[in-house]
Amino acid sequence: MKSEVVVRINENFKKLSRIVSEKGISTVCEEALCPNIMECWGSGTATFMIMGDICTRGCRFCYVKKGKPVLLDHEEPIKVAEAVREMGLDYVVITSVDRDDLADGGASHFSQVVKAVKEMNPDVIVEVLTPDFMGNKELVEKVIGSGVDVFAHNVETVRSLTPLVRDARASYEQSLRVLSYAKNVVKKSSILLGLGESLEEVVETMKDLRNVGVDILVLSQYMRPSIKQLEVKKRYNMEEYKELEKIAYSLGFSYVVALPHARTSYRAKEAYLRAMANVKNNNRWS
């Protein structure tokens, strides 16, 4: 019986992978060799990376290629929408590289992709994991106005390490502002652990995220992609993750994922449903 289940899972994985390949689009799930890909795809969740695979920024923890990005594919919105339908997904995460070369940082393209996905798949829950759009409030609002259900933007690390870890065009304060601009939508952010932060700094960052209304928090271990990226300063054990999870819930987060291999999209649908229940119970957005 177990072997039959494994065969069915593998056949389904190959089918979904083939659809992505035929559409000529990218999923973070495959590109980043995500360890959670089987679980996520099996539960109807996938993360699409739009606007190419070359980033205009050079964050020191990230393995994504840096340089001059490709031209936008104006067929991408419909390609992603069709892939969502053919893959039978019910929760979609749309993310991208930074596109500082574009006047609006890619906000219009994000909006077009979300609208296309929603139009073709009206029951699908859509989460966007966005760049900071240079801290531009109107661009953040433009993306949210396209009909997203979850707005995610990662602060990535604690305040003191931000200049070391992230590109100079990013800042801790700017990321908090971006999250504060998102209104009437579930909000999510992530913190990478093991870059040299203290427990007190992690808790301070949690508090800062709650102060700008973040509902869902993801805590995960930083894993060095290659020798070109920053070294891992510490590997957290499960007891430490449990303690951080406990602290996060005490601060008022609706849902917390605290696991070494967690990614922003891990258990995304479950987190969204919990956050929405919290919103309704507390009459928020009314």
Swiss-Prot record:
Binding residues for [4Fe-4S] cluster 2: C55, C59, C62
GO molecular function: 4 iron, 4 sulfur cluster binding; lipoate synthase activity; metal ion binding
N-terminal signal peptide: none
Keywords, alphabetical: 4Fe-4S, Cytoplasm, Iron, Iron-sulfur, Metal-binding, S-adenosyl-L-methionine, Transferase
Pathways involved: Protein modification; protein lipoylation via endogenous pathway; protein N(6)-(lipoyl)lysine from octanoyl-[acyl-carrier-protein]: step 2/2
Catalytic activity, EC: 2.8.1.8
Record-level GO cellular component terms: cytoplasm
Cited Pfam families: Radical_SAM (PF04055)
Cofactor: [4Fe-4S] cluster
Cofactor note: Binds 2 [4Fe-4S] clusters per subunit. One cluster is coordinated with 3 cysteines and an exchangeable S-adenosyl-L-methionine.
Main location: cytoplasm
EC main group: transferase
Reactions catalysed, as given in the entry: [[Fe-S] cluster scaffold protein carrying a second [4Fe-4S](2+) cluster] + N(6)-octanoyl-L-lysyl-[protein] + 2 oxidized [2Fe-2S]-[ferredoxin] + 2 S-adenosyl-L-methionine + 4 H(+) = [[Fe-S] cluster scaffold protein] + N(6)-[(R)-dihydrolipoyl]-L-lysyl-[protein] + 4 Fe(3+) + 2 hydrogen sulfide + 2 5'-deoxyadenosine + 2 L-methionine + 2 reduced [2Fe-2S]-[ferredoxin]
Binding-site positions, [4Fe-4S] cluster 1: C29, C34, C40, S265
Domain Radical SAM core: 41-254
Places the protein is found: Cytoplasm
NCBIfam families assigned: lipA, PRK05481.1, PRK12928.1
Family statement: Belongs to the radical SAM superfamily. Lipoyl synthase family.
Protein name: Lipoyl synthase
